């Protein structure tokens, strides 16, 4: 089942009740809410993403989204641009989220200018090939926990990964393999 672009471009959508959605057989959620400019909050904690393989651009350009709950998501493979340009996002509930076999982190959190803290420590990033601008322009980000991230020689680019993360106070990258 594909939910690709289901609500993409619904620029005037302010409220969305999808509490009865059964997502247990959904494989693609890419671009699902892309460009939903007027949504301010979204609770997807009931989504079963066990079979979902593609999350790219899922929330990109949700410019007014302030609160997002994706607790218990099973992220895997391609999460490129997942939260790209969610400028006003302040509350991102990632509790219980598992991230396994992630391959693409390009622009995942880029331009999330209001996020102050992220704990992604348990994410499996051993198969990541690109971290191109993953956190770029996260100007309010003060704490980023990725100290357990272990990359491999598959990682070929870290171009501007932390570009303009001007509020970051400390960062432990000792487990990143930068030989790729």
State each model region's role:
Residues 1-180:
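Negatively charged
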């Amino acid at each position: 089942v594909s939910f690709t672009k289901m609500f993409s471009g619904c620029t005037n959508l302010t409220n969305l009740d999808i509490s009865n959605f059964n997502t247990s057989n959904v494989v693609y959620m890419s671009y699902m809410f892309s460009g939903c400019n007027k949504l301010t909050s979204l609770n997807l904690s009931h989504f079963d993403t066990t079979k979902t393989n593609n999350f790219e651009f899922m929330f990109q350009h949700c410019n007014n989204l302030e609160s997002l709950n994706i607790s218990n998501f099973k992220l895997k493979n391609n999460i490129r641009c997942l939260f790209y340009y969610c400028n006003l996002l302040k509350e991102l509930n990632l509790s219980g989220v598992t991230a396994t076999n992630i391959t693409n982190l390009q622009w995942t959190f880029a331009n999330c200018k209001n996020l102050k803290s992220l704990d992604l420590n348990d994410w499996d990033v051993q198969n990541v090939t690109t971290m191109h601008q993953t956190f770029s322009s996260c100007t309010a980000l003060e704490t980023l926990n990725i100290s357990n991230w272990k990359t491999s020689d598959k990682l070929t680019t870290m171009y501007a990964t932390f570009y303009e993360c001007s509020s970051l106070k400390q960062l432990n990258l000792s487990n990143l393999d930068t030989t790729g």
